[in-house]
C-alpha cells in the first residue's frame, strides 16, 4: 500500500506517478494541438485550447465564443479531447501502455465513461426541445464541453437555454475519478445509489443479508462511510458558499449559481444558468471574487482534507 511505504519509497512512487500523469496529458495535448492546426485553427489558439481542453480548465485565448475563431472540425476535435480529460487517467494509461484492443475497449466499457456519454446525450436530447434541431451541432458540442467541466462556450445560443437546475445538478456530479474534471465524481454517485437501493431492500426485509457489490466486487461498509462523508462535506461547502455569497449582497439565485460554478470549477456555468440577469465575474466585488476563488480551490482539492482543518482535534497538540 502507498501509505505503508517508507519515506524514500513514498517520494519515489510519487515521482513515478507524476511522470506518468505528465506524460499522458502532454501526449494528449500535443495530439489535440496538431489535430486542430491541421484542421485550420491558428497555432496560438490551438495551443491555448489544447492545453486548456485536456486539463478541462475552460480558458480561452479570446473572449468571443469558440465558433467565432475555430472551425467545426476543430471544435469536434477539442470536444473529444475535453472528454479524454474527463476520463479516468488510470484506464487511459492501461490502454496506452498495453496497446491491446481489450484495453482500448475498456475506455468505452468503463461505467464512468458510459455515464459521461449518457449525460451528454441527455443534455443534447433535452436541449433539442428548447432550441430545436437547427442548433443540434451547437448543443451536442456544448454538452461534451459541459460534462467534461471544461465549459467552453461554442455559440451564443446553447445550453444556457436549458433549465438551470439541470445544469447545476450535472455540474455538481462531475466527471470520472482520477480525472481533471470537478464535481463529486460519477463513481461516487453510482455507489451511493447502489448503497441506497440496498438499504431500501433491507427495510422491506430486515433480517436479509444484502451485500453491496459493484463490478463483481464486494464493497465494504467502511468504503461507503468515506463516500458519505465526502458527499456530506461537498454539500456542506456548497451550503457555505451560498451563505457566504448571499452575505455579500447576492440574491439566492446568484449565490447558488456562483457557488455551484466555483465548486465544480465550471466558470461558464454562471452565465449559462443566469442569462437573463447578465451577471458576470467582472461585476463581482473584491470580496465576492475572493470568496469565489476560495471555493474554487476547495472544489479542486480533496474536500475531506479541507474539512479536517475545521475540526478542533486537528489543531490540538
Residue ranges and their predicted role:
Residues 1-317:
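Membrane-proximal intracellular helices of multi-pass ion channels
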Amino acid at each position: 500500500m502507498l501509505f505503508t511505504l517508507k519515506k524514500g519509497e513514498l517520494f519515489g512512487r510519487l515521482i513515478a506517478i507524476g511522470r506518468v500523469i505528465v506524460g499522458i496529458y502532454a501526449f494528449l495535448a500535443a495530439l489535440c494541438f496538431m489535430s486542430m492546426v491541421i484542421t485550420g485553427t491558428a497555432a496560438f489558439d490551438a495551443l491555448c485550447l489544447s492545453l486548456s481542453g485536456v486539463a478541462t480548465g475552460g480558458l480561452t485565448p479570446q473572449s468571443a465564443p469558440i465558433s467565432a475563431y475555430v472551425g467545426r472540425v476543430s471544435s469536434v476535435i477539442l470536444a473529444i479531447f475535453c472528454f479524454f480529460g474527463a476520463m479516468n487517467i488510470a484506464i487511459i494509461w492501461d490502454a496506452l501502455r498495453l496497446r491491446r484492443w481489450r484495453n482500448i475497449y475498456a475506455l468505452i466499457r468503463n461505467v464512468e465513461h458510459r455515464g459521461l456519454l449518457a449525460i451528454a446525450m441527455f443534455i443534447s436530447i433535452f436541449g433539442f426541445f428548447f432550441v430545436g434541431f437547427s442548433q443540434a451541432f451547437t448543443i451536442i458540442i456544448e454538452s461534451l464541453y459541459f460534462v467534461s467541466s471544461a465549459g467552453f462556450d461554442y455559440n451564443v445560443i446553447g445550453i444556457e437555454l436549458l433549465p438551470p437546475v439541470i445544469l447545476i445538478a450535472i455540474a455538481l456530479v462531475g466527471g470520472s475519478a482520477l480525472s481533471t474534471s470537478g464535481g463529486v465524481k460519477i463513481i461516487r454517485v453510482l455507489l451511493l445509489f447502489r448503497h441506497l437501493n440496498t438499504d431500501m431492500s433491507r427495510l422491506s426485509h430486515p433480517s436479509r443479508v444484502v451485500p453491496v457489490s459493484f463490478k463483481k466486487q464486494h464493497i465494504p461498509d467502511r468504503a461507503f462511510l468515506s463516500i458519505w462523508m465526502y458527499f456530506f462535506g461537498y454539500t456542506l461547502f456548497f451550503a457555505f458558499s451560498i451563505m457566504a455569497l448571499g452575505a455579500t449582497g447576492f440574491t439566492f439565485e446568484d449565490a447558488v449559481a456562483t457557488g455551484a460554478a466555483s465548486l465544480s470549477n465550471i466558470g461558464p456555468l454562471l452565465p449559462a444558468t443566469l442569462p437573463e440577469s447578465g451577471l458576470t465575474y467582472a461585476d463581482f466585488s473584491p470580496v465576492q471574487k475572493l470568496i469565489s476563488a476560495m471555493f474554487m480551490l476547495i472544489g479542486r482539492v480533496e474536500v475531506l482534507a479541507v474539512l479536517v482543518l475545521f475540526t478542533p482535534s486537528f489543531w490540538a497538540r
